[in-house]
Amino acid sequence: ESDRFDYLLIESTGISEPLPVAATFDFRTEGGESLSDVAILDTMVTVVDAVNVLRDYSSADFIRDRGESLGADDKRTMVDLLVEQIEFADVVVLNKIDDASNDQLEAARKIIRALNPVADIVEANFSNVPFERILNTGRFDFERAQQHPLWFKELYGFADHTPETEQYGVGSLVYRARRLFEPTKFNQFLR
């Protein structure tokens, strides 16, 4: 249905890479269809933990070492993921600022600025951010995104690309019913 939604907010997991999400908007099927024909990618937002960003940025840990990997084959390091997320963001939410010391905040700001001098940095607690800082900003720039070294690999590697949903067994569903959803019963069912 046309004009059914004003905005669609896609929230990826903390260990996902933003570039493949953006590249999906640029990809065209064999029939010439593209997600960008029906939706506009407006803003890429990354949330960074002000307390732990310096530790993560200087870490040699693999994501799987912290129990957060997308599977046994996930060979990414914390710093690789952090760098890609910050480099590709239009807005970086520097979160947990009340928990961070002045030195931690200053180090976090410097890391973000070094990796992405054009990003809007929004300082927050509990990721409480004014909507106007992340919605309808017009900040996403496809031309700038296409300059990223991984853009062409992601976009033109789609022929051999296995979607993350298949690769990691991720699925979703939409629950619609006239009866009220009861989370307690659902949790009991899952157990």
Regions found by a protein language model. Give the residues of each.
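Nucleotide-state-sensitive switch-loop elements of NTP-binding domains
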Residues: E1-D80
